Amino acid sequence: MADYSVTSESENLRLQMRRMMDGLHVAMPAKVLAFQPGPPVRVTVQPATQMKITLGEEVSYRSLPQLSGVPVVLPFAQTAGFLLTVPIQPGDTGLLVIPDRGLDNFLQAGDVAAPPFYGDPTLIQPRGHSLTDAIFIPGLSSDAVEIADYSTEAIELRDRERKSYISLGP
């Protein structure tokens, strides 16, 4: 049987930090379950990673919960009014980014959000690294998804096999 006893204060601190980091969410891959073209544009996703659960000496893993109403990040020059949209469908994958602070104030006001001072009645919720604040960036894929004939000299709008494309280059 393994000995899990803590031998020093520094070892105890390292163990506590590891446990804290295990629960910290920053970014992870996710799969689209549903797409709502809006307004506002949102997805329902299933995070493609699992959570480690340690109870004493037992370690198990479980899926993170589905997330609905997740904002989608698209290239958007707001002041010029230009936007690039892409078709998003169930089964597509991308990157979930979990912000340092809650997005409620920013999403509602559309401007710079105040810092999360605890006890401030103007703030909805002063939380950080919460899955409820995730944003989705479409396009992250596994190495199994091949992109044929990738151009290193031009910007292209194309299908994966490059059968249909528009190329802008020097």
What are these regions (language model features)?
Residues 2-170:
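Hydrophobic packing positions characteristic
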